[in-house]
UniProtKB/Swiss-Prot annotation:
Tetradecamer that assembles into a two heptameric rings with a central cavity. Keywords: Hydrolase, Mitochondrion, Protease, Serine protease, Transit peptide. GO terms for molecular function: ATP-dependent peptidase activity; ATPase binding; serine-type endopeptidase activity. InterPro entries: ClpP, ClpP/crotonase-like_dom_sf, ClpP/TepA, ClpP_His_AS, ClpP_Ser_AS. This is ATP-dependent Clp protease proteolytic subunit 1, mitochondrial. Residues 1-23 form a transit peptide. It catalyses: Hydrolysis of proteins to small peptides in the presence of ATP and magnesium. alpha-casein is the usual test substrate. In the absence of ATP, only oligopeptides shorter than five residues are hydrolyzed (such as succinyl-Leu-Tyr-|-NHMec, and Leu-Tyr-Leu-|-Tyr-Trp, in which cleavage of the -Tyr-|-Leu- and -Tyr-|-Trp bonds also occurs). CDD domains: S14_ClpP_2. It comes from the Eukaryota. GO terms for biological process: mitochondrial unfolded protein response; protein quality control for misfolded or incompletely synthesized proteins. One of its GO terms (cellular component) is mitochondrial matrix. Its EC number is 3.4.21.92. HAMAP family: ClpP.
Length: 219
């Protein structure tokens, strides 16, 4: 039974891209005859809850993938709950998370709180059908991938072709998870498209809008 929450004065590096440093809360959990201290993310992991609360980069993706694989090894049937509040980021890092979500047999329920933009919106849509949720004031943004290139003309052409291939693949993934036609997905993603929770529901990115119930879903 959870008893107390402490705040540590130590700091941890949460993302390699922003080098953000914040104090990580610790909790004290009563277990049988004794107590055990966890950082808050480890404690949530015990309840099969993982958090994507930063830009998507290789460092964050590695940590999140490791958590998904660990929870899959613990139970291949119990749901995993992924909470998303992310502006997006690296396409390749996001696709690594996406492929892991699709590979494991444990269903992944996705929840957007705050925002799910760019790759964040794709990972939101990639949750188990019927288990993709938005909180009432969440914002979702979809768009096509972007990037730059420099060097010789040949190098620039190669890079442009790769971005075009990634754009096509991302469009196909959105089609698969939303049920919307490829042409409509391509038109929608041509520019930044911001959506409310209700608009994301209509678009097929989420299955429901959660009301504030005061309880946190677990397995």
């Amino acid at each position: 039974m959870l008893r107390r929450i402490l705040t540590t004065s130590s700091v941890r590096n949460l993302t390699s891209s922003t080098q953000a440093r914040v104090g990580i809360p610790f909790v004290i959990d009563n277990e049988g005859k004794g107590e055990r201290t966890y950082d808050i993310y480890s404690r949530l992991l015990r309840d099969r809850i993982v958090c994507l609360m930063t830009p998507v980069d290789d460092f964050m993706a590695s940590a999140l993938i490791a958590q998904l694989l660990f929870l899959q090894s613990e139970s291949s049937k119990k749901p995993i709950h992924m909470y998303i509040n992310s502006p997006g980021g690296s396409v390749t890092a996001g696709l690594a998370i996406y492929d892991t979500m699709q590979m494991i047999s444990a269903p992944v329920a996705t929840w957007v709180i705050g925002q799910a933009s760019s790759m964040g919106s794709l990972l939101l849509a990639a949750g188990e059908k019927g288990m993709r949720s938005a909180l009432p004031n969440a914002r979702i943004m979809v768009h096509q991938p972007s990037g730059g290139a420099q060097g010789t003309c040949s190098d620039i052409v190669i890079r442009a072709e790769e971005i075009t291939r990634l754009k096509k693949r991302l469009n196909e993934i959105y089609v698969h998870h939303t049920g919307i036609s490829y042409d409509e997905i391509e038109r929608t993603l041509d520019r930044d498209r911001f959506m409310s929770a209700q608009e994301a529901l209509k678009f097929g990115l989420v299955d429901k809008i959660e009301k504030h119930t005061g309880s946190m879903p677990t397995d």
